[in-house]
From Swiss-Prot:
Keywords of this entry: Amino-acid biosynthesis, Arginine biosynthesis, Cytoplasm, Lyase
PANTHER family membership: ARGININOSUCCINATE LYASE
EC annotation from Swiss-Prot or TrEMBL: 4.3.2.1
Recorded metabolic or biological pathway in which this protein acts: Amino-acid biosynthesis; L-arginine biosynthesis; L-arginine from L-ornithine and carbamoyl phosphate: step 3/3
Listed InterPro entries: Arg_succ_lyase_C, Argininosuccinate_lyase, Fumarase/histidase_N, Fumarate_lyase_fam, Fumarate_lyase_N, L-Aspartase-like
Swiss-Prot/TrEMBL catalytic activity: 2-(N(omega)-L-arginino)succinate = fumarate + L-arginine
Protein name: Argininosuccinate lyase
Record-stated family: Belongs to the lyase 1 family. Argininosuccinate lyase subfamily.
Molecular functions (GO terms): argininosuccinate lyase activity
Organism: Methanococcus vannielii (strain ATCC 35089 / DSM 1224 / JCM 13029 / OCM 148 / SB)
């Protein structure tokens, strides 16, 4: 029987009720964190002379044994509700209630689970950041390799202006940079301690909340006990960051799918990330990119579900909060898997430089620079130049002739003169790109500068990540060994 029910509640729980209410399926994510929390709390109880050193050391020794054998070695009886009671029941079985039953003094499962979630989530966030840094490094290498590879950029999915493929890759690096920063920002709000808040009103025991905060490597305390046990905003913030990252990554998937079609044919996805058809032998389908695109969409649903669960809950702890965790962990599983797949696809793509250049040379992608050249060389207003070049494009399309064959006549009709050299330069995609060397532009030298700038940022991210990981490792080493 559940050790919690024998007092106030006389009867045992029906089996279907047990299965309905247990959280053990996803408690695997907080198993080690719960043991860390137990050890830190017990250590503090001994130091405060609330629990004897003799009893406390026995509890800690047994907790370390449980950590080594793992969760699957325990009696995962759903009648025990959750991993907290599974571990406590195991301790009581080994040490007796007079010893093990003292571990929970001055604590509630409410502040315990709130602490466990933060301990586990901070590690997941760092795992995500590590994968993003690795992916960013691979993307920067690709961008540098293609700093001079001419391609065409799109607006409204219509050809717009020539750019470099390196510049296009850096657009995704730039988004990932912001994602990394968001996760680091969220980490500061995840890594705060609710331990000691009790059920919702702290405790009458002389506990030392700052001591457990230090033992567990938290930055600071959540001081208000009611907020401490009820706050799950750190989960919402993390899931929102994951959803935003998922949206950014879905753009990469979409570009891989689109640009690998025969109509674009500018990139080819490696065979290991594709499939073929059961009936059409010629097919090379971008299955991994498509599945990633779909999986990334589920992140938004998980976020909205959690927000809906939390909306208008009475203050402090409610069991509804238990149903948040599965959606949180599912989102972390999904984003981690998708980062790995997308990094693999981007790192192994074949780039068709000839096709990219061919696309950039047709369909009037250089029209903007032609208008700009008129402004610079003929000293006319841009809006006037815009109209003249627009007329030139329309005439070219309607009469099915090349711009170069009619350009002089159109300019002459508008009282303008431009040398052949200037015209050829304006219509050359590479010359177009070279001119756009302002900060953030697609010019090769600006792409190379941006790559170095992003690498410097990446080094700072790596240092920040390593510092945080070492801090967590030190906590685990201190408490578990």
């Amino acid at each position: 029987m559940n050790i919690l029910r024998r007092g106030r509640l006389g009867s045992s729980v029906k089996e279907d009720v047990m299965k309905f209410t247990t959280s053990l399926e996803f408690d695997k994510e907080i198993f080690q964190s719960d043991i860390l929390c137990d050890i830190a709390h017990t250590t503090m109880l001994m130091e405060q002379k609330i629990v004897s050193i003799e009893f406390g050391e026995k509890v800690i020794e047994e907790l370390k044994k449980i950590a080594k054998v793992g969760m699957d070695s325990l009696n995962l009886d759903p009648s025990l509700d959750d991993i907290h009671m599974v571990i406590e029941s195991e301790l009581i079985k080994k040490l007796g209630e007079d010893v093990a039953g003292r571990m929970h003094t001055g604590r509630s499962r409410n502040d315990e689970v709130a602490t466990d979630l933060r301990l586990s989530l901070r590690k997941k966030v760092l795992e995500i950041v590590k994968l993003l840094i690795d992916m960013e490094e691979n993307m920067l290498s690709l961008a540098k390799e293609h700093s001079e590879t001419i391609t065409v950029g799109y607006t409204h999915l219509q050809q717009a202006q020539p750019v470099t493929f390196g510049h296009q890759i850096l657009s995704h690096v730039s988004a990932v940079e912001r994602d990394i920063s968001r996760f680091f920002d969220a980490y500061n709000r995840i890594n705060i301690s609710p331990l000691g808040c009790g059920a919702m009103a702290t405790t009458g025991f002389n506990i030392d909340r700052k001591r457990t905060m230090e033992l567990l490597g938290f930055y600071e305390l959540i001081e208000n006990s009611m907020d401490g046990v009820s706050s799950r905003d750190f989960i919402v913030e993390t899931m929102a960051n994951i959803s935003m990252l998922g949206t950014n990554l879905s753009k990469i998937c979409e570009e891989l799918i689109l640009f690998s079609t025969a109509e674009f044919k500018t990139v080819e996805i490696a065979d290991e990330y594709t499939s073929t058809s059961s009936i059409m032998p010629q097919k090379k389908n971008p299955d991994v990119a498509e599945i990633a695109r779909a999986k990334l969409s589920t992140l938004n649903g998980n976020l909205i579900t959690v927000l809906t669960i939390m909306k208008a809950l009475p203050n402090t702890y409610n069991r509804d909060l238990q149903e948040i965790s599965p959606h949180l962990w599912k989102s972390t599983y999904t984003i981690i898997d998708c980062i790995k797949m997308i990094d693999g696809m981007v790192s192994t793509i074949k780039v068709n430089k000839e096709r990219m250049k061919e696309n950039a040379e047709k369909n009037y992608a250089t029209a903007t620079e032609l208008a700009d050249t008129l402004v610079r060389e003929c000293n006319i207003a841009f809006r006037m130049a815009h109209g003249i070049v627009g007329e030139l494009v329309r005439t070219s399309i309607e009469e099915k002739v090349e711009i170069k064959d009619i350009i002089l006549d159109v300019f002459k009709a508008n009282g303008l003169h431009l040398s052949k050299e200037k015209i050829d330069s304006a219509l050359d995609p590479y010359e177009n790109v070279k001119l756009r060397d302002v900060i953030g532009g697609p010019a090769p030298k600006e792409v190379e500068r941006a790559v170095l700038s992003f690498k410097n940022k990446m080094e700072l991210h790596s240092k920040n990540l390593n510092d945080k990981m070492r801090s967590i490792e030190a906590v685990e080493e201190n408490l578990l060994n």
